[in-house]
């Protein structure tokens, strides 16, 4: 196997390809990306047989910013007959060496309006294909996340890529996208960005301790309160920093203190803040440096913030801003865990999470 499929946001194929090329080169896996604008995916072509499996094991998925999912491609099928799409898939898989026994199957599409029209078909196709694969002992009799998951990605009717990913190094979400419902009482749709970030960056079994009731948080650029809403919903107390007006529904909870000051000038009087979150429309380098200052001063233990991207040179901007931030933290002797992701609910921005290492459980 020599191909790896990466899903990404439509319009960000170039950034995804650049990132994958860099990661592959670091691992001494040589090849090149194939991409078309606005298709929502990138195919990386390895020169050496077997390197696809090496890539999906050795690239750390949680360190990828622009890729939503990745899987090694076992076979590509086009012009599948409408009367029997299953047999060609079974025959193709049985002729490929090295395809592991899988514990689940996801029949997906790239995240574009055109491809998503196939999702209804994908849902209908899942049960019969799953049964056929189980009949051939290619899938376990019952779903399990202990072994690889099989992916079938339809990029157009009758044209799909079939492969697999490792459950300890992939996105656990269908199509790499958490399915979240907009809460009708939230003052802004931006609330979904912070909710998705919690799902992506914070393990679910740590929510009770790291997103705990009674914690204090600071929300820079808070108005009208989309991000504050997520914190209040988790029974936190929030310093909302913005010169604009906050939603009255949030103020009525008694959990929010509104400070009408510049987000770059606010300093918490008491150093009891766990979370600093920030979705200000500012130059990304300036926001990144501000978040670094909050952490090294001990004003917060975890930071979650957006970096707005320029129209051109987006990948280079991301690399530079994150490298500068790491250098600043390292120079000040700050130990941390950093992760960045272009989330589904992000647009021309990425979301960065930093956790002070003193706040990380050793278990």
Curated annotation (Swiss-Prot):
Catalytic activity: cytidine(2498) in 23S rRNA + S-adenosyl-L-methionine = 2'-O-methylcytidine(2498) in 23S rRNA + S-adenosyl-L-homocysteine + H(+)
Record-linked Pfam families: FtsJ (PF01728), RlmM_FDX (PF18125), RLMM_N (PF21239)
The organism's place on the tree of life at top rank: Bacteria
MF-aspect GO terms: S-adenosylmethionine-dependent methyltransferase activity
Catalytic residues (positions): 308
Entry GO CC: cytoplasm
Binding site for S-adenosyl-L-methionine: 190, 223-226, 242, 262, 279
Keywords: Cytoplasm, Methyltransferase, rRNA processing, S-adenosyl-L-methionine, Transferase
Listed GO biological process terms: methylation; rRNA processing
Entry EC number(s): 2.1.1.186
Localization of this protein: Cytoplasm
Keyword Endoplasmic reticulum: no
HAMAP family xref list: 23SrRNA_methyltr_M
Role noted for this protein: Catalyzes the 2'-O-methylation at nucleotide C2498 in 23S rRNA.
Subunit structure: Monomer.
Family under the similarity heading: Belongs to the class I-like SAM-binding methyltransferase superfamily. RNA methyltransferase RlmE family. RlmM subfamily.
Record's protein name: Ribosomal RNA large subunit methyltransferase M
Source organism of the structure: Aliivibrio salmonicida (strain LFI1238) (Vibrio salmonicida (strain LFI1238))
Protein encoded by which gene: rlmM
